[in-house]
Amino acid sequence: MFIDKLIESIKAKKSPVVVGLDPRIEKTPQFIKDVAFKRKGENIEGISEALYLFNKGIIDAVYDIVPAVKIQVAFYEAYGIEGFKAFFKTAEYAKSLGLMVIADVKRGDIQEVAKMYSKAYLQNQLFDAITVNPYMGEDTIMPYVEDAIKYNKGIFALVKTSNKGSKDIQDIKTTKGEYVYQSVARMINRISNSAIGKYGYSSIGAVVGATYPEEAKVLRKEMPNCFFLVPGYGAQGGTVEDIMDCFDENGFGAIINSSRSVIYAYQTPYWKDVYSEYEYAQAARAEVILMTGMINNGLVKRKYIAC
Amino acid sequence: MFIDKLIESIKAKKSPVVVGLDPRIEKTPQFIKDVAFKRKGENIEGISEALYLFNKGIIDAVYDIVPAVKIQVAFYEAYGIEGFKAFFKTAEYAKSLGLMVIADVKRGDIQEVAKMYSKAYLQNQLFDAITVNPYMGEDTIMPYVEDAIKYNKGIFALVKTSNKGSKDIQDIKTTKGEYVYQSVARMINRISNSAIGKYGYSSIGAVVGATYPEEAKVLRKEMPNCFFLVPGYGAQGGTVEDIMDCFDENGFGAIINSSRSVIYAYQTPYWKDVYSEYEYAQAARAEVILMTGMINNGLVKRKYIAC
């Protein structure tokens, strides 16, 4: 079952950190672009190759210390066919090193269409889980839930997202005296009952932004079944203290994604004097170790986990 | 400007009908599969070729009588790289015959990611417009709006969708005494002010399901700037009477999509004794002509347009 495997991997790696593979060609080290462009030409193929090679370096550097990677499909989809090739190759490489792979696709559509998205990602052995958008309602989520159960996969439904604009729709106050994201949360938590694993969590989880700690605290109580995929840590502004309430009292219940802060760690003030661009992958590893240490330290302070 | 071009095309073709290219391999005529499988093998490549050949037949049969086609990406995305090739080839072929192409992708994500989706579709000359999901808020829509203005493209944001489950989130009552979809509508209508064309409509439109005529009537008034892309007609249950309130008093304001009822018209009770599967494209043309006639007749009855 997806969620049991995820929890066991978090335990084994002693880390709830997920590395987000959101590569941008303009931030890719020149030496990687040189190799890729020489191999495939200075074109879409070369760009896609560079993104893949960049990812491969990151994966090699972190596969033994994180349970999963999250691949944001848009960074590949932007380059069409060649981009998708890099997306699939990245997933394949991550899986080959034992990582769980979350395809961050945020798809959502009517049932007949959702079935096709589910075929694309949940029925694809390269991916362990996907993110989905709940705006169109429960019937549009069910095809993913059915496939999650059938193929031992997971889904994370958007509940309260990390961006500023998440207030526009998600924070609308309803006549039930709650916010829209709480209504979504209740719907997802109810659906998640159908896929609960041996540790009490469901393979149907939720996306809850690191940037809204108060909301996360409420949601942790209102969605007891649901593991949280937490974006927004690091570059988007979320801190260790902000994410603590995403966890339960045993230190589970959340995986914390960081993309830019990890994969471009070598460009940050903290690491730029230590690592050159040639060492971008070591910098990413150092940042993951730092981030994991800080999060685990936060959990120890809360007495959620032992030292 | 996208919306002006769309309106002029509706006038020129005398039809607000959009054909949805949502091909399913299991419903594809055998003679097409035979050709495709012989050419590419009985595999993903062959399936994708069959979907493309099927679409090509439909496009050849309807390009002179409809302003646009809507291509639902999931039906291609399900087949990975090869599927995407068929998706792009379909768009290219439709454009080559002067059709406007709406990529029904329903993407939605934080700004940095939305920019990449916009690069994938709005910055791609194959597509004239895309559908987007507003759940994550205004800041996640703006990258599409900026590109729509810059590249003369359009967007249709989900407001009230055609499926039954659309009630779950979209119909939540808010403390303002309205429904969530009305809050979304207000947000989109406000955003749409930045892209109004010479006929008074904006290149920023809305998806409003044919299956909810009462809601559409309200939304037509609350979103005066916004053209509606109306799914749900035909196979999903929407009738001519259901969609009339999507139009304004001049007979504009909406394009009506039909997918299954058109592309598989030859299998419907109405046409199956007239057309064989070899004539699936003629059947699609006949259905489009019938549908256009019925809609235009409805508009005449309302005195929105002259005979």
Swiss-Prot record, chains A, B:
InterPro entries tied to this protein: Aldolase_TIM, OMPdecase_type-2, OMPdeCOase_dom, RibuloseP-bd_barrel
Keywords associated with the record: Decarboxylase, Lyase, Pyrimidine biosynthesis
Key word Lyase present: yes
Cross-referenced CDD domains: OMP_decarboxylase_like
E.C. no: 4.1.1.23
Catalyses which reaction(s): orotidine 5'-phosphate + H(+) = UMP + CO2
Superkingdom of origin: Bacteria
One Gene Ontology biological process: 'de novo' UMP biosynthetic process
Pfam families linked: OMPdecase (PF00215)
SMART domains attached to this UniProt entry: OMPdecase (SM00934)
Location of the active site: 106 (proton donor)
GO molecular function (one): orotidine-5'-phosphate decarboxylase activity
Keyword Lyase set for record: yes
HAMAP family recorded: OMPdecase_type2
Family to which the UniProt record says this protein belongs: Belongs to the OMP decarboxylase family. Type 2 subfamily.
Protein name: Orotidine 5'-phosphate decarboxylase
